[in-house]
Swiss-Prot record:
Organism whose genome encodes this protein: Mus musculus (Mouse)
Modified residues (Phosphoserine): S53, S73
Binding site for heme b: H59, H88
Keyword DNA-binding listed: no
Protein name: Hemoglobin subunit zeta
Phosphothreonine carried by residues: T29
Residues the record lists as N-acetylserine modifications: S2
Pfam families (alphabetical): Globin
Domain (Globin) ranges: 2-142
Gene Ontology annotations of biological process type: carbon dioxide transport; erythrocyte maturation; negative regulation of transcription by RNA polymerase II; oxygen transport
Protein's job: The zeta chain is an alpha-type chain of mammalian embryonic hemoglobin.
UniProt entry keywords in alphabetical sequence: Acetylation, Heme, Iron, Metal-binding, Oxygen transport, Phosphoprotein, Transport
Protein family per UniProt: Belongs to the globin family.
Amino acid sequence: MSLMKNERAIIMSMWEKMAAQAEPIGTETLERLFCSYPQTKTYFPHFDLHHGSQQLRAHGFKIMTAVGDAVKSIDNLSSALTKLSELHAYILRVDPVNFKLLSHCLLVTMAARFPADFTPEVHEAWDKFMSILSSILTEKYR
């Protein structure tokens, strides 16, 4: 699966709107993940998982920074995500299904925060983009 030129443009345009709110978007995405899929909390036993905690905000920002880096490397995603894939596969040993769960929570957060901008075309492009990211992040599991 690859992104078409118009999908890349949609993703980059939406990212420009999101980048300034990276920390709150990332935090809200994690809070949605932990609320909707409580089993994902097991990967964060050392975190304060209360609403708006410093650790949630920091990790949310880290996730969104990685998403932003992926947007910047949209034409070479595999190379851009190699270290992140290795970290999650070999060191953190995150169940690959969690990438899809996080992706879904990010899409819901985007829709809630940008209702006028989150058109069906934006939804489709970002869903495809996050599916590609999830797939790349699970490559090292094979």
